[in-house]
Amino acid sequence: PDGKWHSFDLYTNRERVILHTAGEIMVDTRNPQWKWIPILRSNTGLVLLQDNGTPTNPQDDHVSYHNTWIDQNRKPITPSLIYAIAQDRFHTIWVGTSAGIFAIPSSVDFTRSNACKRVVIPRNDGSGLGDYLLDNEQINAIAVDGANRLWVGTATSGIYLLNPVGNIDDPTYTMETVAHFTTDNSIMPSNEVISIAIQKSTGEVFIGTGGGLVSYKSDATEPNSDFSEVYAYPNPVHPTYQGYITITGIMDATEVRILDSGGNLVRTLQGKGGTAVWDGKNAHGQRVASGVYTALCNTRTGKEHGVTKILIMN
């Protein structure tokens, strides 16, 4: 608050190396005293700076350097370059490297262990085998959206939207590819993704590429802490409108049931973060008739509820 600058010494006594060329700094969501810093050149790796809550006093700082990890199969991972780091809602740290992506689960005590996890994608061909997620892809950027999905930008293959399936500490944990955007199927000016930023309140994803900046309006926003601000738009829905109806202001893991004026179930939706989208059709794919519809919102536990009305005019 006094407007003064303070410097941090990234010299670590244990490894006897000097660390420089810092990448984008990530403040750990578990403890803001922990700062994760990718080192882009010379002694490439991750630096963990622990400032003990006193950033103006370097005497009580602790700096540790990490450049080798052991995956779930006891295989060492020593990336030649680290480009990106992000942390999801469950405090898992995702690291993008020159040869793929790996995770440091929140269950790992990184001060005592160098364990990590590489996500396996099943081949689903009857062999029981799988492949590592984005193996040998250079990962330039990682961002987490309001539904806790990963947006992963690569050096040559565009951007992937990945949805976690299961608990990361379980052997069956995997990722499903929700979308894969390239110059062939989108307006992206280049398949070289350099940076990603997400406005979580709106779901807009900004993608910096080798050919310029683009944005994409996703269907996931930051979840609300309660249902006090639930609403739907557009509302009313006019006959000429053919797009999605958005129900926003919902809590995490919300199920939205669309009911007609008679209380009959028309459609069941699953929220993504703070948003659920409805195409205005029933469970059989038919556009619903004119009328007032109720969006009944319930959390997974059923302890909290919210409601909003939608007027359909056909």
Which residue stretches match the model-derived regions?
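Conserved beta-propeller blade signature
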Residues: 34-38, 92-95, 149-153, 203-208
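Short loop/turn segments immediately following the C-termini of beta-strands
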Residues: 30, 38-42, 98, 106, ...
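Glycine-centered coil/turn sites that cap beta-strands in beta-rich domains
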Residues: 225-257, 275-278
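Short coil-to-beta transitions that initiate beta-strands within beta-rich domains
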Residues: 11-30, 68-89, 122-146, 180-199, ...
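Short, surface-exposed loop/turn motifs with a glycine/proline- and acidic-biased composition
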Residues: 271-303
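Blade-level signature of beta-propeller repeat domains, shared across WD40, Kelch, NHL, RCC1
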Residues: 191-227
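Short loop/turn segments immediately following beta-strands, especially the blade-tip
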Residues: 1-5, 49-59, 105-116, 163-173, ...
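Short, glycine-anchored, charge-dense loop/turn motifs used at functional sites
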Residues: 255-266, 293
